[in-house]
């Protein structure tokens, strides 16, 4: 039998715990950094250099594109070249200086992804300003907090977000003095701005302010902060993560090394669809990598229902997604299959089993079944535009059944990554054609050191033969601290190691499996500790539910859950079992609840979960957990305190009912 490949090597020994600190496992590094970490490209000391050097090298390459609207209908993508974008950026920078914006001022950007978003960001980069994205999904309270906390003096804003921005007034106007619309400004908006002591400009009007003026660009250092990204914590106020130029240029060097080592290097011919929020580090660094390669970035129209149409028109080569988007793709394909009749499904399932079988034997997705790719799976590829060669999933765990399905049917590499805003995104990423990495986030990228730290209270041992513990990261991609919160910085950054709060398990091939969250642990009344995230990940593999929140507390002896069922599977079950009613009615139906609970219990037993980890009651909510009700963060992480508050009466009723049943049994 051939020896298993290992994608990491050890650089330091592990250490036993001492002085109240837990033990730590060995320090590991990517095999692609065997001869040291890659140096950033010569002359590339800042984010501005990333763009400037590409303008010099690829002036006529298409850079930013958006769909042309002709007679109210979307047409082809229309492009601005690197040189054209540079010329606008220089004008915008001159305008910023002409209205008195000083070095290291904080500049807010508020709105959905667009060419203007990137142009505003590059103008900040040119003049050494701190770019502060204002979350499109956080609402007025958080936007007001970020403007005031980071002392934002000027905001670039999407036209339809102007009214939202004004809701932060007058509190935000202590610092915010100037507003620039990505589009036009109405007379009423000008008047409203005046009442708050603000000056508001339309995009073209603001650009004219810099005409005929020339300001010297300041020298940018690697250590300079280029952006403060506020992360939406699951509790408390957002934290301002300071990202330096060095973090981003180091990350780019690591991505170049990784993709070259995996024979998937980026080129000028690559095309990217920009739809994941630029206010998140995931999309920001991907776009920086594309800009560094002189590649093209096309923007979506801002509507998730039209995303597939935009994909078909743009034909991207790299498609980045969060699991929610890929879950939708998976559910849509499953529905098409079951609606297509027995024969169609039989052919598809046979083709799937055949190709997956050969991939399990070590063949690449290209070699496993070219015939079935052409006859059966090509339609899936066409649905993503026809040119996608890599799908990269990040921000949250991707369910294994979705990942394995897409690896077979999408005719491209499906990779899962892991990173935090604090680590400048990319920290781990799985590798092309390595089926053994299914369900993991892959090995480390070649610019960080990784070690696990034991978590004794959760019985995770970083020195055990199967090493488990809190993931800790060291390297130049790490953030420079939380803005104005040195206390919080000291909590997570200890001796150069970032403590992520995520619990991981090293796999034999050097990839990392995220198994738990350090803080998501509570005790049941009988004294048993429950690692809730781990349990939710297992229940999340049940195809009959799209999302599940598990709850317990120290006054009760058992767990309960709130779930969003998979509509298609629930309706199919109802039809097969003679249960009537629409989707909303089915979610209230006791038999439907028993069915979903039964599926979860079946999975729990299959995974040999402990008795106290098995859910005893369930409530079905037809409305998915969402940001509108403040139940999720913008990266789709569950806000547990808010979920508890929202579903408190339902939870109380479930416990009352089950406890009454227990009591009646005597």
Swiss-Prot record:
UniProt keywords (A-Z) are: ATP-binding, Fatty acid metabolism, Ligase, Lipid metabolism, Magnesium, Nucleotide-binding
In this chain, the stretch annotated as Fatty acid-binding covers 495-519
Q: Which terms does the UniProt entry file under GO BP?
A: fatty acid metabolic process; indolebutyric acid metabolic process
Q: Which protein are we looking at? A: Long chain acyl-CoA synthetase 4
Q: In which pathway does it act?
A: Lipid metabolism; fatty acid metabolism
Q: Name one GO molecular function term.
A: ATP binding
The EC number(s) this enzyme carries:
6.2.1.3
Query: What are the annotated GO cellular component locations?
Result: Golgi apparatus
The gene name reads LACS4
Native organism is: Arabidopsis thaliana
Which Pfam families does this entry report, sorted A to Z? AMP-binding
Record InterPro entries:
AMP-binding_CS, AMP-dep_synth/lig_dom, ANL_N_sf, LC-FACS_euk
Report the sequence similarity comment from the record.
Belongs to the ATP-dependent AMP-binding enzyme family.
């Amino acid at each position: 039998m051939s020896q298993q490949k290992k994608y990491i090597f050890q650089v330091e020994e592990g250490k036993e715990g001492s002085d109240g600190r837990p033990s730590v496992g060995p320090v590991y590094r990517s095999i692609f950094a065997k001869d040291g970490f890659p140096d950033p490209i010569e002359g590339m000391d800042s984010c501005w250099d990333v763009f400037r050097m590409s303008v010099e090298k690829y002036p006529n390459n298409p850079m930013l594109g958006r769909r042309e609207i002709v007679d109210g209908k979307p047409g082809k993508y229309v492009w601005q070249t690197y040189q054209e974008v540079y010329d606008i950026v220089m004008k915008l920078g001159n305008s910023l200086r002409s209205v008195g914006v000083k070095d290291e001022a904080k500049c807010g950007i508020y709105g959905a992804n667009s060419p203007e978003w990137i142009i505003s960001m590059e103008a900040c980069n040119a003049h050494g300003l701190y770019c502060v994205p204002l979350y499109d999904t956080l609402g007025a309270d958080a936007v007001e907090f970020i403007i005031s906390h980071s002392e934002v003096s000027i905001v670039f804003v999407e036209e339809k977000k102007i009214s939202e921005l004004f809701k932060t007034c007058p509190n935000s106007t202590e610092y915010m003095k100037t507003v620039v619309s990505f589009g036009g400004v109405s007379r009423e908006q000008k008047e409203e701005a005046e009442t708050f002591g603000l000056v508001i400009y339309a995009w073209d009007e603001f650009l004219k302010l810099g005409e005929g003026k020339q300001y010297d660009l300041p020298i940018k250092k690697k250590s300079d902060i280029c952006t403060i990204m506020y992360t939406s914590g699951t509790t408390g106020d957002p934290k301002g993560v300071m990202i330096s130029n060095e973090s981003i240029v180091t990350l780019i060097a690591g991505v170049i090394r990784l993709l070259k080592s995996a024979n998937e290097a980026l080129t000028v011919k690559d095309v990217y669809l920009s739809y994941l929020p630029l206010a998140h580090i995931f999309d920001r660094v991907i776009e920086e990598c594309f800009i560094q390669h002189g590649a093209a970035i096309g923007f979506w129209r801002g509507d998730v229902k039209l995303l597939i149409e935009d994909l078909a028109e743009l034909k991207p080569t790299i498609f980045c997604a969060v699991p929610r988007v890929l879950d939708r793709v998976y559910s849509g394909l499953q529905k098409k299959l079951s609606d297509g009749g027995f024969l169609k499904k039989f052919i598809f399932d046979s083709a799937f089993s055949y190709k997956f079988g050969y991939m399990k034997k070590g063949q690449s997705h290209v070699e496993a079944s070219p015939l079935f790719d052409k006859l059966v799976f090509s339609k899936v590829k066409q649905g993503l535009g026809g040119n996608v060669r890599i799908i990269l999933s990040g921000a949250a765990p991707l369910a294994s059944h979705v990942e394995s399905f897409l690896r077979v049917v999408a005719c491209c590499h499906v990779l899962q990554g892991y990173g935090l805003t604090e680590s400048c995104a990319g920290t781990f990423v799985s590798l092309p054609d390595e089926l053994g990495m299914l369900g993991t986030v892959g090995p480390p990228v070649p610019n960080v050191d990784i070690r696990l730290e034991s978590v004794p209270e959760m019985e995770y041992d970083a020195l055990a033969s199967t090493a488990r513990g809190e993931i800790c990261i060291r390297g130049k991609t790490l953030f420079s601290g939380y803005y104005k919160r040195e206390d919080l910085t000291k909590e997570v950054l200890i001796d150069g190691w970032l403590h992520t709060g995520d619990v991981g398990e090293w796999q034999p091939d050097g990839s990392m499996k995220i198994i738990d969250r350090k803080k998501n642990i509570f005790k049941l009344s009988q004294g048993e500790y429950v690692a809730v995230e781990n349990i939710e990940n297992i229940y999340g593999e049940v195809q009959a539910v799209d999302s599940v929140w598990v709850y317990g507390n120290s006054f009760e002896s058992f767990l309960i859950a709130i779930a969003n069922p998979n509509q298609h599977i629930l309706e199919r079950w109802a039809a097969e079992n003679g249960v009537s009613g629409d989707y909303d009615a089915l979610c209230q139906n006791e038999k439907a609840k028993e069915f979903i609970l039964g599926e979860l219990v079946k999975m729990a037993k299959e995974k040999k979960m402990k008795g106290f980890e098995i859910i005893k009651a369930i409530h079905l909510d037809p409305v998915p957990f969402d940001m509108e009700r403040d139940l999720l963060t913008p990266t789709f992480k569950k806000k547990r305190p808010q979920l508890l508050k929202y579903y408190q009466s339902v939870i109380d009723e479930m416990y009352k009912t089950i406890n009454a049943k227990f009591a009646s049994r005597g």
